[in-house]
Amino acid sequence: MHSISALLSLLGGLALSSAAPTQNITSDAYFYGQSPAVYPSPEGTGTGSWASAYEKAKAFVAQLTDDEKVNLTAGVSSKTGCSGFIAEIPRLNFTGLCVSDASNGLRGTDYVNGWSSGIHVGASWNRTLARDRAKYMGQEFHRKGVNLLLGPVVGPLGRVAEGGRNWEGFSNDPYLTGALVYETVQGVQSSGVGVSTKHYIGNEQETNRNPETVNGVDVASVSSNIDDKTIHELYLWPFQDAVLAGSVAIMCSYERINNSYACQNSKTLNGLLKTELGFQGYVITDWGAQHGGIASANAGLDMVMPETTLWGSNLTTAIANGTMEASRLDDMATRIIATWYQLNQDTDFPTPGVGMPASAQSEHQVVVGTAPDEKSTLLESAIEGHVLVKNTNNALPLQTPQLVSVFGYDAKVTDSFDLASTVLGTSPLFQNYTLWVGGGSGSNSPAYVIAPLNAIQQQAYEDGTSVLWDVSAQDPEVDPTSEACLVFINSFATEGYDRSALTDDYSDTLVTNVASKCNNTIVVVHNAGIRLVYNWIDHENVTAVVLAHLPGQDTGHALVDILYGRANPSGKLPYTIAKQASDYGSLLHPSEPQTPYGLFPQSDFSEGVYIDYRAFDKDNITPQFEFGFGLSYTTFAYSGLSIEKTNETTSEYPPSAAIQEGGNPRLWDDLVTVTAEVQNSGSVDGAEVAQLYVGIPNGPVRQLRGFDKVLLSAGETAQVSFSLNRRDLSTWNVEAQQWQLQSGTYQVYVGRSSRDLPLTGEFSI
């Protein structure tokens, strides 16, 4: 949360006149040059699959007046429910652009589904499911005339354990996040809807994300201070995968990067994104994230949302007075129109925002976004993000118990749901109800919500059994004949605020109260991020624990399928759960303003690449549940590790090649192949996520560099194969400004999680 009272106290001691740098800094001039300048902004080249789209776009833009070009670069108000809108150009049959939230379903409208959130997809560790979910979700956006989906999220990457938006992203690991964002981009865009991968870059906390005026004093956005090596090996990594997948837009974020605002940072926009990664699409602001006028255009920004007072006629004035080149405006317009052609939105695309009025309660055309063929994927995506972390004496699956008792506020659905209320500050909505999604612009508008209690009651109806429930008391009465007591709690998070803690006393007391009266207490946690469990995880009567994350509208159906054994849990943690909050060290809380930087809050990423499991490994800290951990109703055995180098004449640096989408294409050359065998050694069919970790010389102990989810019948064995490309095995050389293969021995680990790795080997380069 924003520590306003603490900030007021801090500002009380700040001199508002010029001060020495060793005291209170009062001018941002102190920070000039910390983010290197990269100019001019590169023009889109139409490389690869973009060639035809760019040819058409250039012909289109050549017909535009300067005012029409300018109008393409900023949003305007509209009568639609689109989050943002680019005005139409009727004389050229350009119908405008509707851009809308969110990464887990269309928000603020009706007749659409509420899909599982990013953290849930991350916990599934399933590439195919990620793509299918994205494809069907994109089709819903298409039917509603949405040109651009505002997502997926790969920043934040989960650096701060209490980060308020971590749940919108896939995981705390760049490789897993990159693999899943690649599939998501491809899936959504296969439907003819574009994505704007966000929030670029280093957007790792909500605290001080926007400038504020406190007690009459202006306070800038927090600055994420990241060195070049760290930005490449962690935070840029998944964006590179998104660009490689063809992401047509990238959304720049609110914060400053090395003390330059993200939406006018020429190093990250012109240098990293448009030059190094060869990005061909356009850069769009987060809402209200533009802080400079012509400077932001020259730095590589292409589109402002939801509107702007800093551009408009100022762009043409700047061209006239020489402070901006006419070619920059042409490139901005060309990039935007090229995406329209790239996605074939010039042909048979619905009217932008059709069936989406500004107010869902006003009269409007019925446009059904949902479709019958997506239902199985909707349910499967809800199922696979559940992670079973404890299951003593096979407490799960339930064996048709005659009496189940249900406790906890999270078991029931909300009394009402207002489609228009889900922007910021929705925590009261979920304090006493089941959590299917987090809060903020990343929330969604479900067609329905099947709460756990409803689904359990339906199961009892079908089985001819009984359910007792008390979902309001913290210390409920328990029928002593209950065969199982299910306790439902949650851990909410939202845009706009970081979490105040990773536990809460009310929920923990509820769990221990029930467990003291029931010797088969099963805890289900719907968690929008890391949730610590040390207060009750070792209680002898807590027999099973399911981290249910954010499943979307099919939450109850998915959970009951797992509880009753129709589905075998296969989720794995996409983050590390510590034994105690202090184990996260300096990365537990967001950075707060401190003297001498009270007016310019600083967040120093001094830990480098050591976040989440990398930090736990480095400091030899034993977690409660490690990254990649998750139980099943069956068991899996590993054997037969094989490591084969596929390129014996590997150079230290990648061979030179023309930059394409994603950067130097030689980064994707496969160098090593690792194979292993996985056997379902139990008696139940199930899916296992085989994980490959590599220890690169002079780097972290191990880093995820491959995973393969395989469905195996009881007793079945399958081979898993991992291809390691040049980027997978390289580290960023700051001096050479290239990915470099280290000389030495590379350690290889294959297994069930980041700390359960029965197969080990090595190879040398």
UniProtKB/Swiss-Prot annotation:
Glycans are attached at residues 24, 71, 93, 126, 258, 314, 321, 432, 519, 541, 647. It is found in: Secreted. The active site is at residue 286. Residues 1-19 form the signal peptide. GO terms for biological process: cellulose catabolic process. One of its GO terms (molecular function) is beta-glucosidase activity. Its EC number is 3.2.1.21. One of its GO terms (cellular component) is extracellular region. Pathway: Glycan metabolism; cellulose degradation. It catalyses: Hydrolysis of terminal, non-reducing beta-D-glucosyl residues with release of beta-D-glucose. Its main location: secreted. It holds the Pfam family Glyco_hydro_3_C. Beta-glucosidases are one of a number of cellulolytic enzymes involved in the degradation of cellulosic biomass. Catalyzes the last step releasing glucose from the inhibitory cellobiose. This is Probable beta-glucosidase M. It comes from Aspergillus niger (strain ATCC MYA-4892 / CBS 513.88 / FGSC A1513).
